[in-house]
């Protein structure tokens, strides 16, 4: 089994992206699955192109993209991605699409087909703060999650795919009072446990993971 895991480069004025740094720390074999790592640019469209090139090259069974969500308290597997780019800031090449569909022929939304609740349980059971997230935003993270699931729906029907957001690391919040963070070691451990849960669970578990609002 092959797992392709991607991490974004830094963006938005940050000098580091914990998503990419944590991806670099993950073991290359988890529960017998080969883990292949890929750095992707925080750039609309180019990020997706790079992922599809790698899919064509290695033919993975699972694709997991990792992104930074500053302000979150834990590691958060995403439930759904929407067909909308609405960038609050520019990407790393100056693009700032506003209210633009990612794919004109795509569905309004695509749901992750990863066992997101099993992933959360595996992390929490091992002391890593985690919860299901119901929004991936409207920046490049959502763009990538939606785009990969679009490709799965249209072309790579046997691939399981989804997205995980991770918090800031402590060095990023030195000048951001009252902003949560998590050590890079805990983030990397959370990603490793998530991959373990994906490899061991073809179907998700039935447990509460929703939110009131």
Curated annotation (Swiss-Prot):
Localization per Swiss-Prot or TrEMBL: Cytoplasm
Active site positions, chain numbering: 78, 141, 165
Highest taxon in the source lineage: Bacteria
GO biological process, one term: proteolysis
Substrates-to-products reaction catalysed: Release of an N-terminal pyroglutamyl group from a polypeptide, the second amino acid generally not being Pro
Any one cellular-component term (Gene Ontology): cytosol
GO molecular-function terms, A-Z: pyroglutamyl-peptidase activity
Top-level class of the enzyme under EC nomenclature: hydrolase
Enzyme nomenclature, EC number: 3.4.19.3
UniProt-listed SUPFAM superfamilies: Pyrrolidone carboxyl peptidase (pyroglutamate aminopeptidase) (SSF53182)
Keyword Plastid (UniProt): no
Gene3D superfamilies, per database record: Peptidase C15, pyroglutamyl peptidase I-like
Swiss-Prot/TrEMBL keywords: Cytoplasm, Hydrolase, Protease, Thiol protease
Record's keyword annotation contains Membrane: no
Primary localization class, coarse: cytoplasm
Oligomer status and interactors: Homotetramer.
Protein family membership: Belongs to the peptidase C15 family.
Role of this protein: Removes 5-oxoproline from various penultimate amino acid residues except L-proline.
Protein name: Pyrrolidone-carboxylate peptidase
Organism: Clostridium perfringens (strain SM101 / Type A)
Taxon lineage: Bacteria, Bacillati, Bacillota, Clostridia, Eubacteriales
Gene name of the record: pcp
């Amino acid at each position: 089994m092959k797992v392709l895991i991607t991490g974004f480069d830094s963006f938005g004025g940050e000098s580091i992206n914990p998503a990419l740094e944590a991806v670099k720390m993950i073991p290359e074999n988890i529960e017998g699955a080969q883990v292949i790592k890929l750095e992707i640019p925080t750039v609309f469209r180019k990020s997706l192109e790079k992922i599809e090139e790698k899919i064509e090259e290695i033919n993975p069974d699972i694709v997991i993209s990792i992104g930074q969500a500053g302000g979150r308290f834990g590691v958060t597997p995403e439930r759904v991605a929407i067909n909308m780019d609405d960038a609050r800031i520019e990407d790393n090449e100056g693009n700032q699409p506003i209210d633009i569909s990612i794919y004109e022929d795509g569905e309004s939304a695509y749901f992750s087909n990863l066992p997101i609740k099993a992933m959360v349980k595996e992390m929490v059971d091992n002391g890593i703060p985690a919860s299901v997230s119901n929004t991936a935003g409207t920046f490049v993270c959502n763009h990538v999650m939606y785009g990969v699931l679009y490709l799965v729906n249209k072309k790579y029907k046997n691939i399981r795919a989804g997205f995980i957001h991770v918090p800031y690391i402590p060095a990023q919040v030195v000048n951001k009072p009252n902003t949560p963070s998590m050590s890079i070691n805990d983030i990397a451990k959370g990603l490793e446990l998530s991959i373990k849960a994906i490899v061991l669970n073809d179907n998700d578990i039935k447990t509460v993971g929703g939110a009131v609002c």
